[in-house]
Amino acid sequence: MGILSKIFGTGGFENDPIPQLQSILPAVAIAKIHSGKLPVLQSDKLILKKGELCHFVDVAAIITDRKHYQSRRRGSSVSVARGWVIHTGSTTSVPVTTGEVTKGIFYITNKRIVFVASRHGFSHVISSLTAVTDYDNGLELQFSSRTHRLILPDAFTAKKVIDLLT
């Protein structure tokens, strides 16, 4: 079962199609992870702290909920006499939540889990990770009260790295 079908029922968005992501993680690193060892990868964009090593890097997309309001109007008009019309009606605002997909780069180091993107990026220490749910095409990471839903080309390998680090 995919992450989108679990979260949104049938999966998919009306405005934002599910991105098809091509992995950038080297095959040698994937083989090393599946054998139970953590590879050390070079990260050109991520600034590593002292003593920090990058063990996983891949393209990803984060799913965030975007809430906006739509107006609903209804009413009627009644002609009382010639030139006299009575109008009645009301307007209500209805909240509508849609999913927004943002592409970026997902890193797992020995100290942090980082998603770098133009919007909705995050960086959390691994010790604050409280739950990980893996799906066929993504991961759901919970850090105390904040949950991040990510689409990944190889979610199983990312989950394996997190399991090796925790």
Predicted regions mapped to residue ranges:
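Acidic, Ser/Thr- and proline-rich intrinsically disordered linker/docking segments
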Residues: 2-15, 20-25, 62, 68-69, ...
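Anionic N-terminal interaction surfaces
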Residues: 3-103
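Short charge-dense sequence patches
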Residues: 76-82, 110-117
